Swiss-Prot record:
CDD domains: 5TM_YidC_Alb3, EcYidC-like_peri. This is Membrane protein insertase YidC. It is found in: Cell inner membrane. It is a multi-pass membrane protein. Disulfide bonds: none annotated. Pfam families: 60KD_IMP, YidC_periplas.
Length: 559
């Protein structure tokens, strides 16, 4: 049996499978490997949602938890906002937040350290309420049969400070309704995307009340602007708890009432994730809360946590503290805010490999100061670590290349007698001490590491807006002049030339086409990823050439 041909066909078949999987995702079909498809993040039509989702008329303001007795009726998300709603804009060194006096909700968040696109002088807009995006952070107070201040209630701003001048910036809003006075205090620190949010709830009535505070993110189901159709990244809801750990939920599952997540917890967080960025509500640790994911309207979803405050006697005040992360997926900073928050950077089943790679990459960047050269250095280190395996692989391939003429002679000698041909081939392999799979197995061991590195480079917000040299001004977008993809195609052709030529003409043609197929795909991939593959291929070529030349010289000496 020609084992090489079988292995090559297996590789080719698997490549076709991957291409088909990407085609399925691109066309809104379920992924073959269980990943979410764009259909799960795409806007749903009103007809489909009305027919399949009974929750499409769910109010934007939650009902009180069952523990507080009968739920109250509250205004829905379509309730008109007061005409005199005021916008309050506050600015720190990293954030510009726009609050609406309606509910003291955050209706726009601009990340001042991140440009909207490569070369843009406009900041990245994460939260917004506009024609192209609905994505807001909201809070409020609810109670059984009561009309407490919610995110649809007019609030008055009671502070004058609008720009950060020291280390902290505080903005405060106040409203009174249903016998409760609610004061919302937002505290922002210099250099931080973590907003501390405090609710002080005072019973100004004559009877005891049982209020609950809710923390809510409201978002449409659309993919972020500029999402690539050539590689998939997750956009949806994430829930974390110590009990169930990190859980991702697609908007499609929420719309179909198929969402699986922890409902009751006293730890963790709830948020919405997209490529490079995230928002998350983090209630105080040890505080019991009810998590709720639901569809408010067609293509409008809410992720919320509800905390019961217990009985509040007349004249008494109770407080609730939480944190709101609104910013980049900065793993180190997020881990300092809450356990598990850094897991929004999700490497899947390769996390055990990817996290050490990211740590090493971060350390290298602290030395080199440039993410492009960091990728080069990291690739060199990985190739050095795997050099013994690569050496064994290349030596095996070099010896296979040397016996290729003898192998062809055996094929001509035995013709269609496959049994005798296989026996003769096995005898030749034993005589020459060649393992036909010796060139493949060492490479298979390295595959998980290289896939993990692929995900690290794809998911790391550090790549966004990071320049390398000359024409590469942003490693997170494609090469504007397609130089790196062209170099990658050239290195793939060189690798094929260094390998033994497949005896089957069809296989040989397939191998020559592969650089065109994969190189063509790289024209649309981030430059950082293509840089990694270019460096990896170049080092592989140098290793293979050096080892092959060494074996050729040794063979010539034995002569």
């Amino acid at each position: 049996m020609d084992i090489r041909r079988t292995v090559l066909w297996m590789i080719f078949s698997f490549s076709l499978l991957l291409l088909w999987n990407n085609w399925q995702i691109h066309n809104g079909q379920p992924a073959l490997f269980g990943g979410p498809s764009p259909e799960q993040n795409a806007p749903a039509t009103a007809n489909n949602q009305a027919a399949t989702n009974p929750a499409s008329n769910t109010p934007a303001v939650p009902n009180a938890p069952a523990a507080t007795s009968a739920p109250s009726s509250v205004p829905g998300s379509t309730a008109p906002a007061p005409a005199q709603a005021q916008e309050v804009v506050i600015t720190t060194d990293v954030l510009r937040l726009t609050f609406s006096s309606t509910g003291a909700q955050i209706i726009r968040a601009e990340l001042l350290k991140y440009p909207a696109t490569a070369g843009s002088d406009q900041p990245m807009v994460l939260l917004d309420r506009s024609a192209g995006l609905t994505y807001t952070a909201q809070t409020g107070v609810i109670g059984a049969g009561q009309n407490f201040p919610t995110h649809l209630t007019p609030f008055a701003v009671t502070t004058n400070e609008r720009e950060l001048t020291g280390d902290k910036l505080v903005v405060r809003f106040e409203a009174e309704s249903g016998g409760l006075r609610v004061i919302k205090t937002f505290t922002l620190d210099r250099g931080s995307y973590d907003v501390h949010v405090r609710h002080d709830v005072t019973n100004v009535g004559t009877a005891a009340q049982h209020p609950s505070v809710y923390l809510q993110l409201e978002r449409d189901g659309n993919d972020p602007a500029g999402t690539s159709s050539f590689y998939h990244t997750f956009t949806g809801v994430a829930v974390y708890s110590e009990q169930d750990k990190f859980q991702k939920v697609t908007f499609s599952d929420i719309a179909k009432n198929k969402a699986s997540y922890i409902k009751q917890a006293d730890n963790g967080w709830i948020g919405i994730v997209q490529h490079y960025f995230a928002t998350a509500w983090v209630p105080k640790e040890g505080t019991p809360r009810t998590n709720d994911l639901l569809q408010l309207q067609p293509n409008l979803f809410a992720a919320r946590a509800i905390e019961a405050l217990g009985e509040v006697a007349p004249g008494a005040t109770v407080s609730s503290d939480a944190q709101l992360w609104v910013g980049p997926q900065d793993q180190q900073a997020m881990a300092a805010v809450a356990p598990g928050l850094e897991l929004v950077v999700d490497y899947g089943w390769l996390t055990i490999i990817a996290k050490p790679l990211f740590t090493l990459m971060t350390w290298l960047h602290s030395l080199l100061g440039n993410w492009g050269w960091t990728i080069v250095a990291l690739t060199v280190i990985i190739k050095a670590v795997f050099y013994p395996l690569a050496s064994a692989s290349y030596r095996s391939m070099a010896r296979m290349k040397q016996v290729a003429p003898r192998l062809q002679a055996l094929k001509e000698k035995y013709g269609d007698d496959r049994q005798k041909l296989n026996q003769a081939m096995m005898e030749m392999y034993r005589t020459e001490k060649i393992n036909p799979l010796g060139g493949c197995l060492p490479m298979v061991v390295q595959i998980p590491v290289f896939i993990a590195l692929y995900w690290v480079l794809l998911a790391s917000v550090e790549m966004r807006g990071a320049p390398w040299i000359l024409w590469i001004h942003d490693l997170s977008v494609r090469d504007p002049y397609f130089i790196l993809p062209a170099v990658m195609m050239a290195t793939m052709f060189l690798q094929i030339k260094l390998n033994p030529t497949p005896p089957d003409p069809v296989q040989a043609k397939v191998m020559m086409v592969m650089p065109l197929v994969f190189g063509g795909m790289m024209f649309f991939f981030p430059a950082g990823l293509v840089l990694y593959w270019c460096v990896n291929n170049t080092l592989s070529i140098l290793q293979q050439w050096s080892i092959t030349r060494s074996i050729t010289r040794q063979t010539a000496k034995r002569g």
